[in-house]
UniProtKB/Swiss-Prot annotation:
CDD domains found in the cross-reference section: pdxS (cd04727)
Cited InterPro entries: Aldolase_TIM (IPR013785), PdxS/SNZ (IPR001852), PdxS/SNZ_N (IPR033755), RibuloseP-bd_barrel (IPR011060)
Sequence similarity: Belongs to the PdxS/SNZ family.
Entry EC no(s): 4.3.3.6
Chemical reaction(s) catalysed: aldehydo-D-ribose 5-phosphate + D-glyceraldehyde 3-phosphate + L-glutamine = pyridoxal 5'-phosphate + L-glutamate + phosphate + 3 H2O + H(+)
PROSITE patterns per record: PDXS_SNZ_1, PDXS_SNZ_2
Entry protein name: Pyridoxal 5'-phosphate synthase subunit PdxS
Pathway given in the UniProt record: Cofactor biosynthesis; pyridoxal 5'-phosphate biosynthesis
Statement: the UniProt record of this protein carries the keyword Lyase: yes
Gene3D superfamilies, per the entry: Aldolase class I (3.20.20.70)
Record note on quaternary structure: In the presence of PdxT, forms a dodecamer of heterodimers.
Gene name in the database record: pdxS
Length: 295
C-alpha cells in the first residue's frame, strides 16, 4: 500500500485560510492562550524565541515534543512547529504528533547544508522562508505550501523583511512580462524550477501565500508589511519581549487587519509600553545572520 501524502491543493488551501492574520511564536501553553485570545490565527510552538536563540548561540534544535503537545492541548487554533533545515526525523516526529504545519526554519541550526526537505513527501503542509524569487520557487518546487520572508529573526529590525518582500514582488512582476522563450534561461540564472516559474508567469502571482516574518516588532511594522503585499504576519520575539505582551499581541492583530487605518494604528501605539530592544543588522557578521542559512 502506498503511503499517504497531502495534495498541494489541500495543503495550499489550509495555508490560504490563515491569510490576513497574525501567527505568533509561543514557548508555553500560557503564551499560546494569550495569543489565541488576542486573535492570532495560529501559533508557532518553540522552546526559545529567536532573540533568545540568537543570544544563547550554540546549536538550536527542534522544540521538545512535550512543549509542542502542551501548546496543542491548550488552544483550538492551528499549531505550527519548527524543524531544522534538512532534518527528516525532526519533521517526521512533528508530523506524527499531528501539528498543523511545520516550518523548515533557518532560525534553527541547519542539519543539512546541501539539501532541504522534500516537503511534497509529507502529509503535513510546510512553511519556508525566502529572500528572493529563486528561493521562493525552489521551496515551492520541493512542496512548500506557504512562504514567509526570512527577514533577520530576533532583531526587532524590519529592514530585512522589507527588503525580501520587495525583492520577491519585484521579481514576480518582472517574470509576468517576460517572453516565454526567456523563462528557461531565467530559471537557470536564479536556480529555480522552470515549471514553477511558468506557473507564476501564467497566473501573475505566487501559487502560495507569502507572509512577512523576521523583525516585526511594532503594530506599525505589521501594517507596513501588509502594505507591501504580505498575505499575513509572523511575529517572533516582538510580542513576548515587549513590556505588555497581551496589549502588544492585540495591537499587532488589529494593525494587521486594519493596516491602512493610520488613526487606529496611532491610537494602538500610544497605549503600548516599550517594544523589544532592536539590533542593527549591519553590525551582525555573516555567520550571525540567520537569513544566510539555506539556499
Amino acid at each position: 500500500m502506498s503511503k499517504q501524502v497531502g495534495s498541494d491543493r489541500v495543503k495550499r488551501g489550509m495555508a490560504e485560510m490563515q491569510k490576513g492574520g497574525v501567527i505568533m511564536d509561543v514557548v508555553n501553553a500560557e503564551q499560546a492562550k494569550i495569543a489565541e485570545e488576542a486573535g492570532a490565527v495560529a501559533v508557532m510552538a518553540l522552546e526559545r524565541v529567536p532573540s533568545d536563540i540568537r543570544a544563547a548561540g550554540g546549536v538550536a534544535r527542534a522544540c521538545n515534543p512535550k512543549i509542542v503537545q502542551e501548546v496543542m492541548d491548550a488552544v483550538s487554533i492551528p499549531v505550527m512547529a519548527k524543524c531544522r533545515i534538512g532534518h527528516i526525523t525532526e519533521a517526521r516526529v512533528l508530523e506524527s504528533m499531528g501539528v498543523d504545519y511545520i516550518d523548515e526554519s533557518e532560525v534553527l541550526t541547519p542539519a543539512d547544508e546541501e539539501y532541504h526537505l522534500l516537503k511534497s513527501d509529507y502529509t503535513v503542509p510546510f512553511v519556508c522562508g525566502c529572500r528572493n524569487l529563486g528561493e521562493a520557487a525552489r521551496r515551492i518546487g520541493e512542496g512548500a505550501a506557504m512562504l514567509r520572508t526570512k527577514g533577520e529573526p530576533g532583531t526587532g529590525n524590519i529592514v530585512e523583511a522589507v527588503r525580501h518582500m520587495r525583492q520577491v514582488n519585484s521579481e514576480v512582476a518582472k517574470l509576468t512580462v517576460m517572453p516565454d522563450d526567456e523563462i528557461m534561461t531565467f530559471a537557470k540564472e536564479i536556480g529555480a524550477p522552470y515549471e514553477v516559474l511558468k506557473s507564476i508567469k501564467d497566473n501573475g502571482r505566487l501559487p502560495v501565500v507569502n507572509f512577512a516574518a523576521g523583525g516585526v516588532a511594532t503594530p506599525q511594522d505589521a501594517a507596513l508589511m501588509m502594505q507591501l503585499g504580505a498575505d499575513g504576519v509572523f511575529v517572533g520575539s516582538g510580542i513576548f519581549k515587549s513590556e505588555d505582551p497581551e496589549k502588544f499581541a492585540k495591537a499587532i492583530v488589529q494593525a494587521t487587519t486594519h493596516y491602512t487605518d493610520y488613526e487606529l494604528i496611532g491610537k494602538l501605539a500610544q497605549e503600548l509600553g516599550e517594544a523589544m530592544r532592536g539590533l542593527d543588522v549591519n553590525q551582525l557578521s555573516l555567520e550571525e545572520r540567520m537569513q544566510e542559512r539555506g539556499w
